Curated annotation (Swiss-Prot):
Cross-referenced PANTHER family: E3 UBIQUITIN-PROTEIN LIGASE SMURF1 (PTHR11254:SF293), HECT DOMAIN UBIQUITIN-PROTEIN LIGASE (PTHR11254)
Top-level taxon of the source organism: Eukaryota
Polar residues compositional bias, start-end: 221-234
Protein's UniProt name: E3 ubiquitin-protein ligase SMURF1
One of the GO biological process terms: proteasome-mediated ubiquitin-dependent protein catabolic process
Region of interest (Disordered), ranges: 210-235
EC number(s) reported in the record: 2.3.2.26
GO CC annotations, alphabetized: cytoplasm; plasma membrane
């Protein structure tokens, strides 16, 4: 979340206070739990905010943020109250508070989530106070900063104790005398990796289960001599492995400032492997569990702890060795592996669906908790109006919940209107008639960037817009109704283009270049490192390398010629356009989140499935007020089977708002925003006049069908509704 620090009157700075949750609040009533809410006051400034009330709990979760203007001498008081009692008398319902003095504010800024002990409002109060509150103070300065570890002891008023300090970009946790990372379940402090919170006094409650690795070494490295950050050779690009002063290993993505306990070299779903199947621990390692049951690992050699099982690295190393045919796995003379090279026999296959779940989770952490991205357009001018509205928004605004409205229509957007907007917009935006894109060849209808798009002086801004729309669709779980060439997706991933990528785009050119590589071209071809292409009826020349028109292609340099030709074929005149599109896409989808995917996988993530499997459709359809053997249901599927592919896609778009199917199939159709899970395609038999047309509820993926008397009438009414109607209304 990006926050711009502004000054008011030259003496105040803007900080964002996030009140995440509270834990272990005092229970004052024997028979019922409190309804806690938090109150935030900047003392003496008149600024006052209150969170939502959470019903019947001692562990409320708010995750709400507030922008505060804080002067150099201001303090912030955060108090928690029981909403059930605040109206009874003065001071009733008080559950605890914490006051941050000015020096505490300056030291706590940009240090991540901190857990603070709640205190009494006055030392003489009789009511007992207990529990903690988790908060963070953020400014723009945290991104990319390193800084030292913050020691916040003694900074809190009323002797309020800060649980643990942390440097910028560092996950929060706490070590006692025996290191024990601890988390109170997923999302306890922000819902994602790297937001871990430790409980005070954990040392006394920790019960570690110890399974020693063989030969624990006597010599250890002291924390004072340990490096606090380094770039491992096998870490993904942009990641650094770091160690806190307490000995915890974590990983920092230097470009975004996001930190995590999870080792990026280990696929997240690989952590579910049974520890018993992994063999013994390496020498000097020990496995322990926290009181919550989470397993962590202690490296006595370096005096560090981590959540990642060190044995999982053997699985990854083994897989990379299997992919490298020339790489020999060390084997002893008796055929067994050398010591320390154990790996499980089971193979690990990384599933696209699992990778997509990880991507969705990472993107959900980037979505602001408040506000909407509102788009209101007319169907007649959908392209230009969408362009103007999307381009004037900031990237962080585009990440808010998407709400689309068609001017003059009353439909409420719970997902279906947005899907229809994207469907109609893509039909205009990707149309070669506008000149931004063109078909790859005359008989292959995949899209590629038009090198002659510069005829429109604002074409780069439009490509930026296209990139934003693609990112918007992926970020909010929708699909783009259009297919690009495979090399386009490869470029979007930042991967180099190869000759084999040309086959699906231009088979004839691919065949010619392969022939050049496989045959002796001496005295056969008279080519130079200069190629010709047509632009607006003019024949232009392009040199593949300096002075290329005077450099003959020979048997010795033909590989270089083919490589340069392939690069030119895909990037001729489109470098600026592609960079503008990629910029817009990465404003919503950070590039590092795409690292695990291949080009075919990215194509499915952006475009979904364009082939409709009727058997899968039937198997994942819900029936309401009708049965599978009802005439209406049987006639409906009979009509679907009689449709061609285009009409089936149009029917799917009529009911769901999109012609595309999720890569998991119809079982993963998404419905209204915020639904607990997928919403299946639904056939609903309604009591209505049979002269009426079927109605669709795109937010619920539901089609309402009157009880038609015959198949012919159902077919006619269904076809009319699909092909002749448009617009949304509210019932």
């Amino acid at each position: 979340m990006s926050n711009v620090v502004t000054r008011r009157g030259g003496s105040s700075i803007r900080v964002r206070l996030t009140v995440l949750c509270a834990k272990n609040l005092a229970k004052r009533d024997f028979f019922r739990l409190p309804d806690p809410f938090a109150k935030i006051v900047v003392d003496g400034s008149g600024q006052c905010h209150s969170t939502d009330t959470v019903k019947n709990t001692l562990d409320p979760k708010w995750n709400q943020h507030y922008d505060l203007y804080v002067g150099k001498m201001d303090s912030i008081t955060i108090s928690i109250w029981n909403h059930k009692k605040i109206h009874k008398k003065q001071g009733a319902g008080f559950l605890g508070c914490v006051r941050l003095l000015s020096n505490a504010i300056s030291r706590l800024k940009d240090t991540g989530y901190q857990r603070l002990d709640l205190c009494k409002l006055n030392p003489t109060d009789n009511d007992a106070v207990r529990g903690q509150i988790v908060v963070s103070l953020q400014t723009r300065d945290r991104i990319g900063t390193l800084g030292s570890v913050v020691d916040c002891r003694g900074l809190l008023d009323n002797e309020g104790a800060l649980l643990e300090d942390t440097g910028p970009g560092r996950p929060l946790s706490c070590f006692m005398d025996e290191p024990a990372p601890y988390t109170d379940g997923p999302g306890a402090a922000g819902g994602g990796p790297g937001r871990l919170v430790e409980s005070p006094g954990q040392e006394q409650r920790l019960q570690a289960q110890r399974v020693r690795g063989p030969e624990v070494r006597e010599h250890v490295q002291t924390p004072q001599n340990r490096s606090h950050g380094f770039q491992s050779q096998d870490l993904p690009e942009g990641y650094e492995q770091r160690t806190t002063v307490q000995g915890q290993v974590y990983f920092l993505h230097t470009q975004t400032g996001v930190s995590t306990w999870h080792d990026p070299r280990i696929p997240r779903d690989l952590n579910s492997v049974n520890c018993d199947d992994l063999g013994s621990l390496p020498a000097g390692w020990e496995v322990r569990t926290t009181v919550s049951g989470r397993i962590y690992f202690v490296d006595h050699n370096n005096r560090t702890t981590q959540f990642t099982d060190p044995r999982l690295h053997h699985i990854i190393n083994h897989q990379s060795q299997l992919k490298e045919p020339n790489h020999a796995i060390p084997v002893q003379s008796d055929g067994s592996l050398e010591d320390g090279d154990e790996f499980p026999a089971q193979r690990y296959e990384r599933d696209l669906v699992q990778k997509l779940k990880v991507l969705r989770h990472e993107l959900s952490l980037l979505q602001p908790q408040a506000g909407h991205c509102r788009v209101e357009v007319s169907r007649e001018e959908i392209f230009e109006e969408s362009y103007r509205q999307i381009m004037k928004m900031r990237p962080k605004d585009l990440k808010k919940r998407l709400m689309v409205k068609f001017r003059g229509e009353e439909g409420l957007d719970y997902g279906g209107v947005a899907r229809e907007w994207l469907y109609l917009l893509c039909h205009e935006m990707l149309n070669p008639y506008y000149g931004l894109f063109q078909y790859s060849t005359d008989n292959i209808y995949t899209l590629q960037i038009n090198p002659d798009s510069s005829i429109n002086p604002d074409h780069l801004s439009y490509f930026h817009f296209v990139g934003r729309i693609m990112g918007l669709a992926v970020f909010h779980g929708h699909y783009i109704n259009g297919g690009f060439t495979v090399p386009f997706y490869k470029q979007l991933l930042g991967k180099p283009i190869q000759l084999s990528d040309l086959e699906s785009v231009d088979p004839e050119l691919h065949k010619s270049l392969v022939w050049i590589l496989e045959n002796d071209i001496t005295s056969v071809l008279d080519h130079t490192f200069c190629v010709e292409h047509n632009a607006f009826g003019r024949l232009l020349q392009h040199e593949l390398k300096p002075n290329g028109k005077n450099l003959q292609v020979t048997e010795e340099n033909k590989k270089e010629y083919v490589r340069l030709y392939v690069n030119w074929r895909f990037m001729r005149g489109i470098e600026a356009q592609f960079l503008a599109l990629q910029k817009g896409f990465n404003e919503l989808i950070p590039q590092h989140l795409l690292k695990p995917f291949e080009q075919k996988e990215l194509e499915l993530i952006i475009g979904g499935l364009d082939k409709i499997d009727i058997s899968d459709w039937k198997a994942n359809t819900r029936l309401k007020h009708c049965l599978a053997n009802s005439n209406i249901v049987q006639w409906f599927w009979q009509a679907v089977e009689s449709f061609d592919e285009e009409r089936r896609a149009r029917l799917l778009q009529f009911v769901t708002g999109s012609t595309r199917v999720p890569l998991q199939g119809f079982k993963a159709l998404q419905g209204s925003t915020g639904a607990a899970g997928p919403r299946l395609f639904t056939i609903h038999l309604i009591d209505a006049n049979t002269d009426n047309l079927p109605k669709a509820h795109t937010c619920f993926n539901r089609i309402d069908i009157p009880p038609y008397e015959s198949y012919e009438k159902l077919y006619e009414k269904l076809l009319t509704a699909v092909e002749e109607t448009s617009g949304f209304a509210v019932e």
